[in-house]
Amino acid sequence: MGKISGSKKTILIVLAVFAALVLFPPLALVLAFLLLVRTLEDGRPQPVTEPVAWGACKVEPVELTAGGEPLPVTVTYTVGKGGLKEGGVIRLCPGKVLRLGPDAWQIRMQWGNGWGRLQRKDPSRNNYVEVRAPSADVVISVSMMEKAMDRTQLMWLKRKLMQKLGRDLERMDPRDAFMANLKITARLVQGSLAEGDPVEFVLGAGSGLRPPAGIITTDLACEVDRRGTGDFELDASLGQIDAVGGAPAVLEVIAPTLVAPSERFRVLVRCVDSRGLLSPALAGRLDISYEGAVGGPGSVIMTESGRGTAWFAAGAAGHGLGRIRVSATGHGVEGVSNPVVCRNAGYRLLWGDLHTHSIVSDGTQEPGYLYHRARDLLGWDYTAVSDHDTWSFGEERARTEQEFELMMRAADDHYHPGQFVTMRTYEWTNHRQGHRNVLFGPGQSPVFLPHTDERYSTPGALLAALAGRDAMVIPHHPAWKLHAGEMRFDFGPRDSSEGEGASMQRLVEVYSRHGNSEFYGCPRPISHAGMMEGAKGALVRAVLGKEYAGPNSGSYVRDALASGCRLGLIAGSDEHISAGDPRRAPTQLYSGGITGLFAGSHTREAAWRAMWERRVCGTTGPRMLIEFWVNGAHQGSEISSRSASVTGHVIGTTGLELVELVKFDSSGYRAVWQEGGTGPEVVIDWTDPRLRESCFYYLRVIQDDGHMGWAGPTWVEVEK
């Protein structure tokens, strides 16, 4: 549908009002939508291009406080050699530049970066855009789409409706259309600009640019059409604006959970604000004290370059439990570490997240940043960036070969054996049969098997195609009910009799930022709209109602386990938006989860073995120790016996409200042992003396602060 003229638009508005008053209000809304909203048709791909070193981009200030006061942000683009003639164009592109290679850059839009709507209508409101020429002799015209995100979303919905009605529209990636509509175009209509002349884009002129609620890093790239021919070049000089944490409120002290007696280890101190966001505002001496079986230096310096982080070396001083306290003298902030257990376990508990997303798919940051964040800013032992196999939004297109190669290369580049582990992975994102991450073992060459290819379009077909490879498939948020209606999650074949590759499904993500999929009625139920900010999220939740599957859907983790799937319980973040701690985001309903791997070392081989053997635990964020044995076999094992002796322990980061051992057999699920309310540590010692049938056990934990954890199951086959 083409552009509607002003007079016709007036007539259509009158008709819509008439229909609203006389006929049927919903019909009037549909009529107005069909006639007044333009169909999105032009979504030419953002070019992958070699950047040019021509001008220079500078941003002032370079950071605002997340959730703080709006301030004007000036992006100054200095014209390069040869100048800019009349008709030339400079486009400011707020988003993220993806470096597919040194000479292959592409501007990508950031979904939900939180900076708010840029506008040109009202200088008295936040986010007003003004473009300033260097002199009165130079006239610059400015064009941009008002409410670009909202209007493009409506245009996209109109596109979907027209396709449903039979209109043939060429497939497109919606990000391209969104990115094109978000750009600010400054055209030189009178005069010329010499080399060195500045053009200023003022974001929030007057009332300031409203910062997002959470931490984010956004590129302010410039595209230049020097001749006015419509041929744009991406300048290699990038501006950048950061939203950072506010005033220091708490020190987070992150130490290993399991260490050997007399072992030396590294400790991370993070300064966070009252909402848990990393704060760069603290610098100076930090005083350190020790409790129990740990010791080390009495102080450490947090430098300005540390941007709210400081590392120091400590050590175990024998067997037992220890904690580390850190305080900032004169600043009134302090913190205590997670519990440190000093014992000869023969393995470590590696903490990290197997489920994050980058700008390659629908995240907000480049893959390399996410690896840096995990290792240097969060103190994790491992991570995986599991970008989607497609960009869907109604028009699915598989990742390109160049994108997939970047994903795998980034994982390899950031793997440091003995220090930090990365996994090569991607997400198989089938909205009808369920999402799952595909991980490749240490010696396995990755293969890309998108669900858009008919050969890999079902969970069974995916597993069959992976058969014979060292790979693992991890289902996640199975209880997520799609907005279009109920979805029965397809867990795929349970064993080899049902299909090839069934044994590759070793783990299931019981919890993420989307919520909890343990069982119907569980705490923290699935709420995808919980990831949306403020009023928008509240509205979506009100319209959609419950977003989790029904009690008879078969989509919960307990359903899968009861049906014969042998899956260890883990947790992740499924982080898409925040550049900060995925366990915390002020705009989102739930914290992101993390997974502990009981592994022998910081290597891919050891981490892979721990996952394959299901020696794992998952939490909603804290570093709890959750560990148990059945007849001496570690959680995740499969054993044969006529009785079960269950031993173990849980050490929380706060008091433990409930620790329960859950058993399943033909009678269903039930808690056979419970304890809680006695402090941060619980010891498990329980016996099932006479087993009449095969069963399995797992642990579930609830802390006093509401955080949760899981470990297991362990399966017991009754000896005949």
For each predicted feature, which ranges?
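N-terminal Sec-pathway targeting helices
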Residues: 3-26
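Short amphipathic alpha-helical segments that mediate assembly, nucleic-acid/protein binding
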Residues: 8-10, 154, 263
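Exposed regions on extracellular, virion, or secretory-pathway luminal proteins
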Residues: 9-12, 17, 149-150, 195, ...
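Ser/Thr/Pro/Gly-rich, low-complexity intrinsically disordered stalk/linker tracts of secreted
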Residues: 31-250
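Short, solvent-exposed loop/linker segments at the N-terminal edge
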Residues: 63-70, 83-84, 257-263, 637-642
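Extended, charged catalytic domains and RNA/DNA-binding interfaces, predominantly
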Residues: 250, 260-303, 307-720
